[in-house]
């Protein structure tokens, strides 16, 4: 593997992650902070590592990420999507494996807007019969 850098953009909800991957020892840096420091929740850290663990490249690549917008869950999902795209740039043969795990597809779910006359997006005001 050469010292080439691979890039992938990931999105989830309102978060956008720019992911750079290059040959290394498995360090993951998010917004100039180590992964364990940036994400307090173990589930978020697990989500970020999923594509690397699937293709067994956890200790072969260094990942550098800048992520903006959204909350922790959205950002973790965006980073996962970005890492997946960077891995596909590195080796297109990984696509079927990553596709079967559901990492290639962009999760299109977003918050539904609140409608006029309703309490929330779908919650209607309480109905009183009498």
Curated annotation (Swiss-Prot):
What HAMAP family does this protein map onto? Ribosomal_uS9_B
MF terms (GO), sorted A to Z: RNA binding; structural constituent of ribosome
Q: Which SUPFAM superfamilies match?
A: Ribosomal protein S5 domain 2-like
- What cellular component GO annotations does this protein have? cytosolic small ribosomal subunit
One GO biological process term = translation
Phylogenetic lineage: Bacteria, Pseudomonadati, Pseudomonadota, Gammaproteobacteria, Alteromonadales
Could you tell me which PROSITE patterns the record lists for this protein?
RIBOSOMAL_S9
Q: Check the record and name the PANTHER family matching this protein.
A: RIBOSOMAL PROTEIN S9 (PTHR21569), SMALL RIBOSOMAL SUBUNIT PROTEIN US9M (PTHR21569:SF1)
UniProt xrefs under Pfam families? Ribosomal_S9
Q: Write down the superkingdom of origin.
A: Bacteria
Q: Which keywords does the record carry?
A: Ribonucleoprotein, Ribosomal protein
Tagged with keyword DNA-binding: no
**Which protein family is named in the record?**
Belongs to the universal ribosomal protein uS9 family.
Annotated organism of origin:
Shewanella frigidimarina (strain NCIMB 400)
Q: What is this protein called?
A: Small ribosomal subunit protein uS9
């Amino acid at each position: 593997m050469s010292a080439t850098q691979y890039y992938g953009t990931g999105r989830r909800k309102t978060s956008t992650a720019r992911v750079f991957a290059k040959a290394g020892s498995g360090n993951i840096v998010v917004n100039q902070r180590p992964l364990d420091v940036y994400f307090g929740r173990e589930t978020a850290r697990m989500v970020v590592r999923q594509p690397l663990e699937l293709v067994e490249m956890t200790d072969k690549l260094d990942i550098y990420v800048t992520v903006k917008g959204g909350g922790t869950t959205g950002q973790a999902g965006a980073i996962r999507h970005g890492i997946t795209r960077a891995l596909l740039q590195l080796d297109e043969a990984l696509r079927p494996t990553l596709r079967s795990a559901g990492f290639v597809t962009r999760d299109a779910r977003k918050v539904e807007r609140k409608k006029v006359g309703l309490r929330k997006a779908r919650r209607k005001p309480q109905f009183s019969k009498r």
